[in-house]
């Protein structure tokens, strides 16, 4: 959401090609934007009226960068000879990868035998985290999964395995392969047994 001192965002009725889930709108051909989707405006004033914007892309709001992957958005744009900056806000895929890396590393360094207070704090952290995750569609999905399978914070191993199973559920939903949960410590704490991380 734009700060009060920032421009209002996009003109009324504008639609974007970087919709949640990578959906494509037929209404995007008349928009002019920069390489990151900023400054959308119509090429011509007589463009047809757009359907209501999906949740998160309403009038006056900047598009949710964390809600869509950059590649999906770029496929809908004209070919450009622009080198993209590396210090731009993360897209949905980058945010997801970095979030899972953080969570798995957090679980890998969780105490082997946590105190009751640590167990409660970690379970609470996971619940709060799922409420504030920037991609609302993703956050809602994680909350539903957590409701079905509460975080097991009783030990480091239990928590790491619970998180790996949760991640594999999401991977299956996205058509990605499962990770072998017996190897979480190799991946996130100790390094691969072949010594390639030493």
Curated annotation (Swiss-Prot):
Q: Which cofactor does it need?
A: FAD
Residues binding FAD, per UniProt: 92-100, 104, 133, 164-176, 187-188
CC per GO annotation? extracellular space; mitochondrial intermembrane space; mitochondrion
Matching Gene3D superfamilies: ERV/ALR sulfhydryl oxidase domain (1.20.120.310)
Q: Could you mention a single GO BP entry for this protein?
A: cellular response to toxic substance
Instruction: Give the EC number(s) under which this enzyme is classified.
Output: 1.8.3.2
Where is this chain primarily localised? Answer: mitochondrion
- Cysteine-cysteine disulfides: 135-138, 164-181
Put simply, this protein is called: FAD-linked sulfhydryl oxidase ALR
Protein species of origin: Rattus norvegicus
């Amino acid at each position: 959401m734009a700060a009060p001192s920032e421009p209002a965002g996009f003109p009324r009725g504008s639609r974007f090609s970087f919709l949640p889930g990578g959906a494509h709108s037929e209404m995007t051909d008349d928009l002019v934007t920069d390489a990151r989707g900023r400054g959308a405006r119509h090429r011509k004033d007589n463009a047809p009226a757009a359907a209501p914007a999906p949740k998160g892309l309403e009038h006056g709001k900047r598009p949710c960068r964390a809600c869509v992957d950059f590649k999906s958005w770029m496929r809908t744009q004209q070919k450009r000879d622009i080198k993209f900056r590396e210090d731009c806000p993360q897209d949905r895929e980058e945010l997801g990868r970095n979030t899972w890396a953080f969570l798995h590393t957090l679980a890998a360094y969780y105490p082997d035998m946590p105190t009751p207070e640590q167990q409660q704090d970690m379970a609470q952290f996971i619940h709060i985290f799922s409420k504030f995750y920037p991609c609302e569609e993703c956050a809602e999905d994680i909350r539903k999964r957590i409701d079905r399978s509460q975080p097991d914070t009783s030990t480091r191993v239990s928590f790491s395995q619970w998180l790996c199973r949760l991640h594999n559920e999401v991977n299956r939903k996205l058509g990605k392969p499962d990770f072998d949960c017996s190897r979480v410590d190799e991946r996130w704490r100790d390094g691969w047994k072949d010594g390639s991380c030493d």
